[in-house]
Amino acid sequence: MKKLVSICILVALYGATFAQNSIISITASPAEDTRKGMNISWATDKSISSAKIEFTTVRDSNWKNAMVKIFNGEYCATYDSLYSKRPDGKNFYEDVKINKYNAHIHGLKKNTLYKYRIITEEDTSDVHYFKTSGSKNWEACIISDFHAYAPLYHRTKSAMDMIGTVEKYSNPLDWVLHLGDITAWGGCYSFWQNLYSEKPFHNYMWAGVNGNHDNMTRTNKGNTNKFFRDAAAYPLNGYEGELGVCYFFKYGDVLFIMLNNENMRSEEGLQKAQEWVKRVVAENPAKYKVVCEHYQWFFGANGKDSQYPRWNKLFDELGITLALAGNNHIYASTHPLCDGKVVEPGKGTVYIQTTSSDNERGSACDLEKPIEYNGEKIKFRWTEGAKTISAMHMKVTGKKMVLTLLDRNGKILDITEVFPIKK
């Protein structure tokens, strides 16, 4: 009986969201230069053609100095009529004919906490927040692979609670970085909509990469990067076919380059991505250079090569400081590597991949057994098996980056220091 009541409550909560709120799926994404700008994404019913965004600093308690800008929505049917699941487990087809808004706001103050809200003639959203960059010192949460799925809300809750654990470890955070697979099926718009109602999406700028699950439909047919693209408002500075999916931005002294592994499966796709990365690095000098993709660098269970040999030579050439990934659901971090060998800190790229964080889809391996491959490269591995939850805290200063792996209870499992590479 208790289970039935819980399901009914979930259905009532999630089913009412679109009907009661004319403004949905609000999220802040980085602009190319996060010192002065931010990208805000939201959607409305197609009957609403324009909306205002009102923003000001958090110190402006009465919104007296708020700026207001009007943006027009663009009709979006990317997710319409796709097969999906409701919170009660019932099958349905998404009915998503919306106007989508990608708002770039600029002229912001650096290193400042802002608040914002969306306003239509019918509705005013809750207040959301983001922080601009500008300080050499900042902190973020890194998380991935929580596979948000309407019938199993505990997946989302596990990940959001884990972000809370990182907040307790070091508060305040400046933003959140995800490494893909934050939805079970990216083609199910209701999954994104429900996810964006969570508190961490209200409180932070989020940047992320397209995971294979974010790229797929429930039927695994008609998969496309448009699901990821239209769920946020990432910078349109990628390459052909990847605008708003592959992108780069700067936060403080760090250049982040975000890749889409789904379009790098072929050698041709890989070459296009690598040529773009070369151009981005050449045109955007930075103390730290971080490349992110979803697929793992090594297979965590045995250490076997995965994406590492596809990228390591280019990373060596470009002086990439840190390479981040997810997908394998087993944490692994390496020593600094260059030319396939372990080198001194500041002389090579550090590779790290995250675990899953949904307490359900983790991967098991015997950590007591000696690792079979690349044991000299990989310094630490960790997993809890199927029910794994973890995230990383990232602290950046002018001298180094420190990445700390935390378990669900806030216990420190691994600390990796990453230093700028001097070419």
What is the meaning of each model-derived region?
Residues 59-96, 140-160, 220, 230-237, ...:
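Acidic/histidine-rich helix-loop elements
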Residues 135-148, 269-306, 358, 419:
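Mobile, glycine- and charge-enriched loop segments
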Residues 142-144, 175-181, 185, 206-212, ...:
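Active-site neighborhood of phospho(di)ester-bond hydrolases with catalytic His/Asp-centered motifs
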